[in-house]
Amino acid sequence: EQMTKIPRESGNEAAISEYLVNFAKEHNLDYVQEPCKNVIITKPATPGYEDAPRVILQGHMDMVCVKDDELDFNFETDALPIYVDGDWLRTKGTTLGADNGIAVAMSLAILADETLEHPALTVLVTTEEETGMDGVMALDPANVPGDILINIDSEEEGVALASCAGGV
């Protein structure tokens, strides 16, 4: 819900990038914020998982920005008009930003949960995916330690792809 209050149109990711940096600081996690505003957050393995392969959870912070024509809304400055409908989070006349806010929210929830047992984790959140993969193209691989990468940006719920280059 907090992320829906931060405008994050492609090319306008400075505020959401800072939000991620502040999250890392608040949780005493190591992080790197790249010049292109990509954010990489790392968390050590829990006891017993130190020798397991490091997992990278990857998503992007920008969102598809579409609204109803008659709606007075500015994606560069306005918080999304969200509301709860039963078990669903919805908006009034705009896209929700679940592409790919869901990856960011899931990754932050995993990082914040002190009860989960896990290997060393790297959370990679890139910029400008919706307009040309600019964040990925500017990424410094030296900033992204890991052995297994899970990209959390799928078109279908419950479907996983292995060894897929996607849009690259």
Roles of regions detected by a PLM:
Residues 14, 133, 150:
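Metal-dependent catalytic neighborhoods of phosphoester/phosphodiester hydrolases
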Residues 1-87:
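Acidic/His- and Gly-rich active-site-bordering loop/insert found
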Residues 27, 42-44, 110, 135-138:
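A generic local structural motif
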Residues 36-40, 130-132, 157:
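Short acidic loop-to-helix transition motifs that present clustered carboxylates
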Residues 31, 162-165:
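Short Gly/Pro-enriched turn/cap motifs at secondary-structure boundaries
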Residues 49-125, 129-131, 137-147:
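Active-site metal-coordination/substrate-binding segment of hydrolases
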Residues 139-162:
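A glycine-rich helix N-cap at a beta->alpha junction
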